[in-house]
């Protein structure tokens, strides 16, 4: 009788195992386990199989992470090849240009000569286009390296969705870019063809930026809301960021930010604030060969900033409506001051605050020649004049540094458009 009971026990246990593992597609194994006569045999079998499932999931996760790393390394190698090809194209374009053609089309738009929008792409020579594309690809390479490092440090949180995005979204865009580069390498098109090719390449690169941004969203959930930067890789009239909040009426202000750019001539417009009836209510701009300027109610003061060396710089501008007194700080040190800048004119409320573009109309009217090219982070605004000590704390990343009481740098408050991107940045850890 005991033998019959044991046989029935094993049979029931086998049935429980078959039910609990019905979703497995591998071979089924049967395990007989001694349990008390009055115990729940199905529950015991599930507990015994739980450890095995956990081990299987861990092994699968490790395999996924390894595949992700291999995919990222493959993308980095592809970008190196693209950069090499672009270099060869640029060299060939220089050799093909005649003595009088080497610098043609390279002049910057003068005021009043019309906007350099995407419809005017043929104004930029091929060598400059290829140089910009090379810089953009280098930026993509850096961001892929950041993704690789993030994957290595946070492998336990990776999923198959990241792998799928890496394979399906980066691969097809890189094939498009490679095709465009080969076209440039093999033939010499006329101005119309050059314009079309550049437009197609920039469109592909913009899409690639957007799709890499989707991958970088995996980092966003695991970082503080202020540990990010904005990147504007190309000088266009459609790439920008918008601050969701507007400004109140202000009789004094301090605006501070971190900037990194090597654009020349002129880094462009880090930010602009427009209100109904006045597009230049508050603007910071460096255009052409002019020095950087601050505009308040269309009144101008020249600032002593020199920041287009490809390094991170912290800049601040303070202003009070009384006598229009202003001060300018670079890297924590005051470099200039003045007065009579829009005196007794308060900053008007209910406007539109844009990062990366100069507004000719409320919320729009962007001009590609005035666009900011580079990286921007920790944009803060206060409704008072900060002291030199407070500015220094910001520039040195002191624990005493303050966040803006009007506009504080927060990822949830910034919307990006046209291929501008957000990715992780910690001031003073990544600078220079």
From Swiss-Prot:
Gene Ontology cellular-component terms listed: endoplasmic reticulum; glutamatergic synapse; synaptic cleft; transport vesicle
Pentraxin (PTX) domain ranges (all copies): 226-428
Signal peptide: 1-22
PTM: Glycosylated.
Location of region: Disordered: 90-128
Binding sites annotated in the UniProt record for Ca(2+) 1: 280, 358-360
Annotated positions binding Ca(2+) 2: 358, 360, 370
Molecular-function GO term, any one: metal ion binding
Covalent S-S links between cysteines: 256-316
Database matches in InterPro entries: ConA-like_dom_sf, Neuronal_Pentraxin_Related, Pentaxin_CS, Pentraxin-related
Record text on cofactor binding: Binds 2 calcium ions per subunit.
Compartments, record wording: Secreted; Cytoplasmic vesicle, Secretory vesicle; Endoplasmic reticulum
Any one Pfam family match given in the protein's UniProt record, by short name: Pentaxin
Cofactor dependence: Ca(2+)
Domain of life of the organism encoding this protein: Eukaryota
Residues bearing attached sugar chains per UniProt: 154, 193
SUPFAM superfamilies attached to this UniProt entry: Concanavalin A-like lectins/glucanases
SMART domains: PTX
Tissue expression as described in the entry: Cerebellum, hippocampus and cerebral cortex.
Keyword entries, A-Z: Calcium, Cytoplasmic vesicle, Disulfide bond, Endoplasmic reticulum, Glycoprotein, Metal-binding, Secreted, Signal
Gene Ontology biological process terms, A to Z: axonogenesis involved in innervation; cellular response to glucose stimulus; cellular response to potassium ion; mitochondrial fragmentation involved in apoptotic process; mitochondrial transport; neurotransmitter receptor localization to postsynaptic specialization membrane; postsynaptic density assembly
Subunit structure: Homooligomer or heterooligomer (probably pentamer) with neuronal pentraxin receptor (NPTXR).
Function noted in UniProt: May be involved in mediating uptake of synaptic material during synapse remodeling or in mediating the synaptic clustering of AMPA glutamate receptors at a subset of excitatory synapses.
Name of the protein: Neuronal pentraxin-1
Organism for this UniProt entry: Rattus norvegicus (Rat)
Gene it is expressed from: Nptx1
């Amino acid at each position: 009788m005991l033998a019959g009971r044991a046989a029935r026990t094993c049979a029931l246990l086998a049935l429980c195992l078959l039910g609990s593992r019905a979703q497995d597609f591998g071979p089924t194994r049967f395990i007989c386990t001694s349990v008390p006569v009055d115990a729940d045999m199905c529950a015991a079998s599930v507990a015994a199989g739980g450890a095995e499932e956990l081990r299987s999931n861990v092994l699968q996760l490790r395999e996924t992470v390894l595949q992700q790393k291999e995919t990222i390394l493959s993308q980095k190698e592809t970008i190196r090849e693209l950069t090499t090809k672009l270099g060869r194209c640029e060299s060939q374009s220089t050799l093909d240009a005649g003595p009088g053609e080497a610098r043609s089309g390279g002049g910057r738009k003068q005021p009043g000569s019309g906007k350099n929008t995407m419809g005017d792409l043929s104004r930029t020579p091929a060598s400059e286009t290829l140089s910009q594309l090379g810089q953009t690809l280098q930026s993509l390479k850096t961001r892929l390296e950041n993704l690789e490092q993030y994957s290595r440090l946070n492998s336990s949180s990776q999923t198959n969705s990241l792998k799928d995005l890496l394979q399906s979204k980066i691969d097809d865009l890189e094939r498009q870019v490679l095709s465009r580069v080969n076209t440039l390498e093999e033939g010499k098109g006329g101005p119309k063809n050059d314009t079309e090719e550049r437009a197609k390449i920039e469109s592909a690169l913009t899409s690639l930026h957007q799709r890499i941004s989707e991958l970088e969203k995996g980092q966003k959930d695991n970082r503080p809301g202020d540990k990010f930067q904005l990147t504007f890789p190309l000088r266009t009239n459609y790439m920008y960021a918008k601050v969701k909040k507007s400004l109140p009426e202000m009789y004094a202000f301090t605006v501070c930010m971190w900037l990194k750019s090597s654009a020349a001539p002129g880094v462009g417009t880090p930010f602009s604030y427009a209100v109904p009836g006045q597009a230049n209510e508050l603007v910071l701009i460096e255009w052409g060969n002019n020095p950087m300027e601050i505009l308040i109610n269309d009144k101008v003061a020249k600032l002593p900033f020199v920041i287009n060396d490809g390094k991170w710089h912290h800049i601040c501008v303070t202003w009070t409506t009384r006598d229009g007194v202003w001060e300018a700080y670079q890297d924590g040190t005051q470099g200039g001051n003045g007065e009579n800048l829009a005196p007794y004119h308060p900053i008007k409320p209910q406007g539109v605050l844009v990062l990366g573009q100069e507004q000719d109309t409320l919320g729009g009217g962007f001009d590609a020649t005035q666009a900011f090219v580079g990286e921007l982070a920790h944009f803060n605004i206060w409704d008072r004049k900060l002291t030199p000590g407070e500015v220094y704390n910001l520039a040195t990343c002191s624990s005493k540094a303050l966040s803006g009481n009007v506009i504080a740098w927060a990822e949830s408050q910034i919307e990006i458009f046209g291929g501008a991107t957000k990715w992780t940045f910690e001031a003073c850890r990544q600078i220079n």
